[in-house]
């Protein structure tokens, strides 16, 4: 389990990147970390991987502190958004380095993945395209057989075939080895396909986190036609009207919403599920984030 408890991090004298952040990734989960630009997602990830030390609060993996703990760090596979950390080495040189640094490096898996990624192992990574560098990063990281796979915008710039191949490999590790995955991405539709838990961050703190199924069961889109007032008990996040048809985004489980709307005797009442992208937009809209005029 990955746990951040009441974590605060300030850079300089005024910039508070994390503000009492609490985040929990259950063991064996595929957790999608999403948020507005500048929400603090990458800063949170750099605490999880032991790069940053928190000002206050705690950061633990498996109940153990991460910062300056090589035993815990050796169980983490991390792919950052910026791959400049690879420098000018070749894949072959980096694989040899990983073997010395990570006791769990699996040479057989590294060899097996050669047919998946098909990269020249004698070419310096700086000569690879951005997409090829991502391929190399996944090749090396998946060869670690990590207990915890932490990914920051991992498939940005990859073609659809390779994206699907990489997610398939990662999910095989989740199913076969109990790997815990945390992935930060702005591609919410893709996250919806692979994640079972979601956390939404804004301005350094967590707005909400829960399983994806629970999250989607607590928001509903309604299209209705009624001549009667709507019940005051409805928790309306957004509403719009086109002709006689009202479209409402509501917080609440579908059955409760349907029962409440029945009191207004609607002539038409269709309840529709919300996508993760829609939930993200309307949840942030409630914080004052400038998304109030977006309608999906």
Which residues does each PLM region occupy?
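ABC-family P-loop ATPase nucleotide-binding domains
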Residues: 80-136
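Conserved ABC transporter NBD signature motif
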Residues: 57-72
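Helix-to-loop junction immediately C-terminal to a conserved catalytic motif
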Residues: 49
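Short, charged/small-residue-rich alpha-helical element at the C-terminal edge
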Residues: 220-296
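ABC transporter nucleotide-binding domain
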Residues: 166-254
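Catalytic Walker B motif of ABC-type/P-loop ATPase nucleotide-binding domains
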Residues: 149-153
């Amino acid at each position: 389990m990955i746990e951040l408890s009441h974590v605060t991090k300030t850079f300089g004298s005024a910039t508070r990147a994390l503000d009492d952040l609490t985040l929990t990734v259950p063991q064996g989960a595929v957790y999608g970390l999403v948020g507005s630009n500048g929400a603090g997602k990458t800063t949170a990830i750099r605490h999880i991987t032991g790069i940053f030390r928190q000002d206050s609060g705690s950061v633990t993996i498996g109940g153990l502190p991460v910062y300056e703990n090589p035993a815990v760090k050796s169980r983490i596979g991390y792919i950052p958004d910026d791959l400049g950390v690879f420098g000018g080495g070749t894949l072959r040189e980096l694989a040899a380095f990983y073997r010395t640094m990570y006791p769990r490096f699996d040479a057989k898996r590294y060899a097996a993945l050669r047919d998946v990624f098909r990269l020249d192992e004698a070419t310096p990574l700086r000569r690879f395209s951005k997409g090829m560098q991502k391929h190399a990063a996944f090749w090396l990281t998946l060869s670690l057989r990590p207990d915890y796979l932490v990914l920051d915008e991992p498939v940005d710039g990859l073609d659809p075939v390779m994206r699907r191949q990489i997610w398939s490999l990662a999910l095989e590790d989740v199913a076969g080895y109990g790997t815990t995955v945390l992935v930060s991405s702005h591609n919410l539709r893709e996250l919806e396909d692979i994640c079972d838990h979601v956390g939404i961050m804004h301005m350094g703190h967590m707005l909400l986190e829960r399983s994806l199924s629970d999250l989607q069961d607590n928001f509903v889109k309604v299209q209705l036609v009624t001549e009667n007032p709507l019940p005051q008990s409805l928790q309306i996040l957004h509403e719009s009207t086109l002709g006689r048809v009202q479209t409402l985004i509501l917080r609440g489980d579908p059955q409760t919403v349907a029962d409440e709307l029945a009191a207004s005797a609607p002539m038409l009442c269709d309840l529709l599920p919300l996508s993760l992208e829609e939930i993200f937009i309307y949840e942030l809209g409630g914080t004052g984030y400038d998304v109030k005029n977006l309608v999906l």
